[in-house]
């Protein structure tokens, strides 16, 4: 049986969850349509998803059509959940990008399409909600050409309200874009020679799968228009990106989820081989795990299985698998372009509304952060506050609602602040000697630190000979320094500097690598105190796409948000502003743009780097380490 994995992507409220329901219903996987409004859909599982009518976590379901099984990945559609989207994209064989016939191409549509093209995923455009009044498809087509890609091929003829009808094109006009993109076909056409349908279809298929051509289909998911045709297109047009024939096992973990009974589930895409129940499988070429329970989606329901084949998405109950773990042979994993997940740029303090629920809150955060790499937390060793770092405010709203709905814990949040970094101000050296109080470790370490240009990162070198200090001790020093760099003088990560291990001494046989590992961050803190550090704040590069009539407002408002516009371009009655902005200002600037352009602007950002801040330094509480905090305190008293 052919197995394909497709993604359903769209901006908020374009109808992707409703489309998923229609695909399941028309294929016979379910006997009754679920409703977003009634909260009965198969893929929006949390209360917050049902209340808002938006997808927050990746939902997975499936249907079978003739000899093809289709796994559907119903991905999130909000800016703050792009990490979920990117993880899901890595397992797809193809994508359906929904565009609302009423709303056209929205900001989120452009961001998602950018990701799909960057990762090389064949994509179909599905224009949804064509049953609404006042639809002008020619305007939607033009919108797609200007904002997404001009390389589209319209596959259907559409009669709009009130005589709703969608039929496949049979005329030659649908092939214009295909012919124009191939010199041989164009020359043949211009010379008056006839073109066979087969060669046109082959050319379309080639360009579709190399992501240089995008077929356009139409329908209404809510009223079941065009869905049967879309099912045929999905099963015939997409290929499975799996190894054919006998091969070793290879699979990749792309999602971690906890059930209401606190069972930990790992979602895995199999790329080759066969996975059997009770198999012992090597993970990321290291430890092995035993498969004790295995599930997959069959016609919209999760079912236990005893084997799974290449191309399948399986779910294992396992406590040790992590996101991006590879099961089996890592060499068989497809080489697909990656999109870096955005870094958490905000932090805040969280406490339970009821103090007696503190342990419940910590247990819940452990599970949530395990599932979401963009949420990190620690407990301050001095104030005992719980510190969270995260990506955006909507993400925090979702976590708050999840804590209340699933874990029955209400929380109180402080106003979030930006996550900074630190860089040494000058060169400095410091040595802590063995058996010299208050050093309790059987190790001597001497370090030097030098500032480097912005963007250089942390560089480490050792000038201590391996003949003098063996590799295990040297590795322990490097590990301790990397740990120490996580918290500088103000509590932020240390970067843009060179740290040199200049001196080391051990006593045989009492010294161990642990002595060097524990002492290294203490020496690093002392050398940073001699050098001093300056605070660096994150800056984002941005591209703003806005209608030409809003140029003046967008440009003039930039200084108010500390934004520096470095380039302005005009394209298709749209202005593209490029520049950079402090991360602490982007949320307000983006909200302002959305407000005064009535949602017609797009603001794409990525981390550019860090700049030196001015003004009073912002401090972050240190994370606790019971083994070295007391020694740190003693050294800080004497220096």
UniProtKB/Swiss-Prot annotation:
CDD domains registered for this protein in UniProt: Tet_C, Tet_II, Tet_III, Tet_like_IV, TetM_like
Alphabetic keyword roster: Antibiotic resistance, GTP-binding, Nucleotide-binding, Plasmid, Protein biosynthesis
Positions of the tr-type G domain: 1-242
Family: Belongs to the TRAFAC class translation factor GTPase superfamily. Classic translation factor GTPase family. TetM/TetO subfamily.
Record flagged with keyword GTP-binding: yes
GO BP terms: response to antibiotic; ribosome disassembly; translation
Protein name listed in UniProt: Tetracycline resistance protein TetM
UniProt keyword annotation of GTP-binding present: yes
InterPro entries, A to Z: EF-G-like_DII, EFG_II, EFG_III/V, EFG_V-like, G_TR_CS, P-loop_NTPase, Ribosomal_Su5_D2-typ_SF, Ribsml_uS5_D2-typ_fold_subgr
Record-listed GTP binding positions: 10-17, 74-78, 128-131
Pfam families: EF-G_D2 (PF22042), EFG_C (PF00679), EFG_III (PF14492), EFG_IV (PF03764), GTP_EFTU (PF00009)
Top-rank lineage group of the source organism: Bacteria
Function of the molecule: Abolishes the inhibitory effect of tetracyclin on protein synthesis by a non-covalent modification of the ribosomes.
Gene Ontology molecular function: GTP binding; GTPase activity
